[in-house]
Amino acid sequence: MKQQAGIGILLALTTAICWGALPIAMKQVLEVMEPPTIVFYRFLMASIGLGAILAVKKRLPPLRVFRKPRWLILLAVATAGLFGNFILFSSSLQYLSPTASQVIGQLSPVGMMVASVFILKEKMRSTQVVGALMLLSGLVMFFNTSLVEIFTKLTDYTWGVIFGVGAATVWVSYGVAQKVLLRRLASPQILFLLYTLCTIALFPLAKPGVIAQLSHWQLACLIFCGLNTLVGYGALAEAMARWQAAQVSAIITLTPLFTLFFSDLLSLAWPDFFARPMLNLLGYLGAFVVVAGAMYSAIGHRIWGGLRKHTTVVSQPRAGE
């Protein structure tokens, strides 16, 4: 069990690192390529890669599962959610820094929590509410220098925030639908179907020929984005299979900090290619509060449960005392 937990930690960290680096690479490609085209290539590469892996393992999804309309509807909802999330997230990167986009993305777990209560009839814990409030407070701190602009003017920066919030919101529909689909299919099978369907849906919107205009560096970044999608989500699925979902979710919340770390590091090494995040001390602190809130929402109940259990064990009198 310890070995499985160790592997689960490494896989979850792999996902957080992949997702942390992703928007930095995408920002380079967005200088030439529009969001729908980038997302098209990401889904195409991920679909081919995951399809090949499942074919070798003889684990391609059985289509007989979708003979019932209910499962087809759920698949359509999940596809629309992932489609919208990828497009809106890429669009937000046109106006925001990679770190800002990832910090806003932490709203997704809060939305998933609310949706799980109303749609899946799950119980909301007090630690989840506290974590959500911490996260929202962290967002205010992170955007402290831009709050007036965001709420009073419809600037490019405001559009970036709107797209980012939209991406986090539509992701919830994907998350809820996938949670139900997992009763019939394994996570890699669901992802393969979603990648394939999203690739087909994006083809009319994409401009595949633009790839010829990319520099060697930008082409490398685009390939990295495609592989990142395959590895990031694949590692997440394997982590969930080997470790408890709450702990995996807690590690995934570190994603914005990896983005912040990579952005600072790359801007120092190659300032001509990578812009340094324009954050004051309160902004940096806000990023940490956002992550802490998301993490507390994911595992806060386990922390308090462990403390109560420890207190109970310690307070029990022994025989003869």
Curated annotation (Swiss-Prot):
Q: Where in the cell is it found?
A: Cell inner membrane
Q: What happens when the gene is disrupted?
A: No visible effect on bacterial persistence.
For side Cytoplasmic, which residue ranges? 1-5, 57-70, 121-130, 178-190, 238-249, 300-321
Task: Give the record's keywords alphabetically.
Answer: Cell inner membrane, Cell membrane, Membrane, Repeat, Transmembrane, Transmembrane helix, Transport
Which residue ranges run through the membrane? 6-26, 36-56, 71-91, 100-120, 131-151, 157-177, 191-211, 217-237, 250-270, 279-299
Domain EamA, by residue range, is 17-144, 169-292
Q: How does the protein associate with the membrane?
A: Multi-pass membrane protein
The terms describing its cellular component in GO are:
membrane; plasma membrane
InterPro entries per the UniProt record, alphabetical: EamA_dom
The protein's superkingdom reads Bacteria
- Membrane side Periplasmic: which residues? 27-35, 92-99, 152-156, 212-216, 271-278
Instruction: Family membership, please give it.
Output: Belongs to the EamA transporter family.
The name on file for this protein is Uncharacterized inner membrane transporter YhbE
Gene name as annotated: yhbE
